[in-house]
UniProtKB/Swiss-Prot annotation:
Gene Ontology annotations of biological process type: response to host immune response
Pfam family, one: PPE-PPW
Signals that turn on the gene: Highly up-regulated during the early stages of invasion of the human blood-brain barrier.
Annotated PANTHER family: GLUTAMINE-RICH PROTEIN 2
InterPro entries linked: PPE-PPW_C (IPR043641), PPE_dom (IPR000030), PPE_sf (IPR038332)
Protein name, UniProt field: Uncharacterized PPE family protein PPE47/PPE48
Species in which this protein is naturally found: Mycobacterium tuberculosis (strain ATCC 25618 / H37Rv)
Family note: Belongs to the mycobacterial PPE family.
Lineage: Bacteria, Bacillati, Actinomycetota, Actinomycetes, Mycobacteriales
Length: 435
């Protein structure tokens, strides 16, 4: 509002509005709230600055520490700026409250205005023979003064409040705490993956569709005209009793009706369906190309990071894997003593003290050196991690069968053929028989 507008209203209006308002209490409460918020921002900024400085000073060293400090520095700066903005907002609220108090003090009060009106009424009522002309003029001049004073006070109050409103800072949103350069990388990925919508193809198709609609419209109009001509021929033939003209009119009306129906009920819906289908195909193709086009671009950095994390771990296993190349040392092992004579005699059988286990496989000559190794199955290798036995392990020389009355039974693996221990055999039914 401007001064002439304030002058357009009587002083009673301005005085009543200022006196009946909420007063400066709400502005002062808001100023106190902004001051408390400013102090809170300052405390958080100070605490975070200490943490960031401690990290950069040696608590956490290396590139990660540098990235941490670089990521939090903008947030600390925002906290400091937010504290300053909150303090400025508190000051502007206090300035607006002070302007209100000054305007209320300078504004003519309602009792003063009422007294002026009462004095004017008394002077006018007692103005016999014009004796109160000068007092009435002075009274009216005083009212004009209060009118101008009220307008001036309101103009000044408006200027103070407007300046406070303009000077109040607006704090922006807090920055996102991210790795430096991450936004540029994401923007580059988005720019590389998002392709523009094919508006050129859409414009060409719509142009072709518009031309097709125009041709269909011409077909419909020509069919309507042909139907009208055929109807005139039909009526003329009926009136003049001309059968050929009636037949011609009926034929023209028939083909015109077919053309009109074809255009309205077939071609127009087909064109509409084609337009919708083309729009759907372009939109879906654009969306799919952008979605699947982002996978290789985004997958490259992810796979690179994964490879960087896995390769050092695999390289660290090279020392352990190298132990597998150590040669296995074979130690000659004799037949366990516990196996000799460990078979108890079976009731009903005959114990042969000189019984030997007969094998279908010829044993190796005594002069031949046989490498006897422990089997590679069992409790596992003991000692160094990664040691392994040789693949050439002594094989059993045959099978031992627990015979029954029918002469067959479940096969049991024999001991390695290179051991050749003397075992106790059981003859007869239920004895041990070598096959």
């Amino acid at each position: 509002m401007t001064a002439p507008v304030w002058l357009a209203s009587p002083p009673e209006v301005h005085s009543a509005l200022l006196s009946a308002g909420p007063g400066p209490g709400s502005l002062q409460a808001a100023a106190a709230g902004w001051s408390a918020l400013s102090a809170e921002y300052a405390a958080v900024a100070q605490e975070l600055s200490v943490v960031v400085a401690a990290v950069g000073a040696g608590v956490w060293q290396g590139p990660s520490a540098e990235l941490f400090v670089a990521a939090y520095v903008p947030y600390v700066a925002w906290l400091v700026q937010a504290s300053a903005d909150s303090a400025a907002a508190a000051g502007e609220h206090e300035a607006a409250a002070a302007g209100y108090v000054c305007a209320l003090a300078e504004m003519p009060t309602l009792p003063e205005l009422a007294a002026n009106h009462l004095t004017h009424a008394v002077l006018v009522a007692t103005n016999f023979f014009g004796i109160n002309t000068i007092p009435i003029a002075l009274n009216e001049a005083d009212y004009v003064r209060m009118w101008v004073q009220a307008a001036t006070v309101m103009s000044a109050y408006e200027a103070v409040v407007g300046a406070a409103l303009v000077a109040t800072p607006h704090t922006g949103p807090a920055p996102v705490i991210v790795k430096p350069g991450a936004n540029e990388a994401s923007n580059a990925v988005a720019a590389a993956t998002i392709t523009p919508f094919p508006f050129g193809e859409l414009a060409k198709f719509l142009e072709m569709a518009a031309q097709a609609f125009t041709e269909v419209g011409e077909l419909i109009m020509k069919s309507a005209e042909a139907w009208a001509v055929g109807f005139v021929e039909l009526i003329t033939g009926l009136v003049n009793f001309e059968p050929w003209l009636v037949l011609t009119g009926m034929i023209d009306m028939f083909f015109a009706t077919v053309g009109f129906a074809l255009g309205v009920f077939v071609l127009v819906p087909l064109l509409e369906f084609a337009v919708v289908l083309e729009l759907a195909i372009l939109s879906i193709g654009w969306i799919i190309s952008n979605i699947f086009g982002a996978i290789p671009v985004l997958g490259g950095p992810l796979l690179g990071a994964l490879a960087a994390a896995v390769v050092p771990g695999v390289a660290g296993l090279a020392g352990v894997a190298g132990l597998a190349a150590l040669p296995a040392v074979g130690a000659a092992a004799g037949a366990p003593a516990a196996l000799v004579g460990s078979v108890a005699p079976v009731s009903g059988g005959v114990v042969s003290p000189q019984a030997r286990l007969v094998s279908a496989v010829e044993p190796a000559p005594a002069s031949t050196s046989v490498s006897v190794l422990a089997s590679d199955r069992g409790a596992g290798a003991l000692g160094f991690v990664g040691t392994a036995g040789k693949e050439s392990v002594g094989q059993p020389a045959g099978l031992t069968v627990l015979a029954d009355e029918f002469g067959d039974g479940a096969p049991v693996p024999m001991l390695p053929g290179s051991w050749g221990p003397d075992l106790v055999g059981v003859a007869g039914d239920g004895g041990l028989v070598s096959v």
